[in-house]
């Protein structure tokens, strides 16, 4: 408390994984609205957890790699979601693997390619790590999505 809010402090908070601090300084959740692009089809294929992929523009601030409890505005309403940011060590362990932003939206199956839905980051959930199997990765994604549903249900109940 008592420190001046600055873009430098907000950027540092996001990069260091202090999402609560960044959101407090912003006065609203950190959010992106980049176009949904085609991924590699791994989520909808091997994992059974189709994800919305949004590429970070080269100069854009990237929050600390990890899994986040998020909500996304699709088809006229906010939906709880789980978003992973970072390299995907379970899928691609190469040194030059791309940083991705992938969001799993439970109970949603619309085609949103090319759209720019607003994605709000509410809570840091856990770090990105390599799993021994795709089943373990899918279990984490579903667990994070369940936590997101519970988080937003509690938040909405508090209003």
Predicted feature descriptions by range:
Residues 1, 39-159:
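Phosphate/ribose-recognition catalytic cores of enzymes acting on nucleotide-derived substrates
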């Amino acid at each position: 408390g008592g420190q001046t809010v600055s873009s430098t402090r907000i950027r540092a908070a996001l990069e260091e994984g202090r999402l609560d601090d960044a959101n407090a300084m912003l006065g609203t959740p950190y959010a992106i609205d980049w176009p949904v692009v085609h991924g590699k089809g791994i989520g909808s294929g091997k994992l059974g957890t189709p994800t919305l992929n949004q590429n970070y523009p080269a100069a854009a601030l990237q929050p600390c790699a990890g899994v986040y409890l998020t909500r996304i505005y699709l088809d006229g309403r906010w939906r709880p979601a789980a978003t992973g940011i970072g390299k995907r060590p379970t899928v691609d362990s190469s040194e030059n693997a791309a940083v991705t932003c992938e969001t799993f939206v439970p109970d949603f199956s619309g085609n949103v390619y090319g759209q720019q839905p607003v994605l709000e980051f509410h809570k840091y959930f856990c770090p990105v790590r390599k799993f021994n199997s795709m089943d373990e990765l899918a279990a984490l994604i579903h667990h994070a999505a369940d936590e997101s549903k519970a988080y937003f249900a509690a938040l909405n109940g508090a209003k």
